[in-house]
Amino acid sequence: MSERQTSPSRRGFLGVTGAGALTLAAASDASAAPISEVEKANEKVVNDFCAAWTTRDTDKIGSFLAKDAVYRMIETSPPTKGRDAIMAALKDFLGKAKSARFEVLRSTVMGNTVLNDRIDYFELEDSKLKFHISGFFWVVDGKIKEWQDYSWPKVNDKPQTNS
């Protein structure tokens, strides 16, 4: 049986669509069961992690990640494996930032999975950056074990191609 290769743009689209659908479905279901204490704790870990970005302190930000965490910045980037490698990759960028802030618009938690819809703001020396993000977090034993961000395309963005 041959393996089917899926294009990054299709995978990204499905990820964003799925994350958005889950977020909206969970948010709109007034009869949903209350979240458990573990789910509340997992959501708090992610929200505290997002809040820590205002400090730009890589030790503090990294303290929320499991030692063997995996991070994928956007749907088309390769994963970065291990807390030390993740923080090394982010350290240079954060060092150049005059400010950083994650504004969580809404979040949904299901067991160990936390999804958030947020806007990330970064102020650099000569520019201000703003990204609309759907974040996927898998929390185990109070630490973020997996973190993937999916960007929301702008209205005038061109579709991604495989060429």
Go through each PLM region and give its residues.
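A beta-strand edge to alpha-helix "cap/lid" segment located at domain peripheries
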Residues: 15-37, 73, 78, 87-163
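N-terminal secretory signal peptides
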Residues: 1-8, 20
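Short, well-ordered alpha-helical segments enriched in acidic and aromatic residues
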Residues: 56-72
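Twin-arginine (Tat) signal peptide motif
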Residues: 5-14, 28
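Non-transmembrane alpha-helical segments in soluble domains
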Residues: 14, 43, 47-50, 62, ...
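C-terminal segment of N-terminal export signals and the immediately downstream linker at the start
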Residues: 27-56
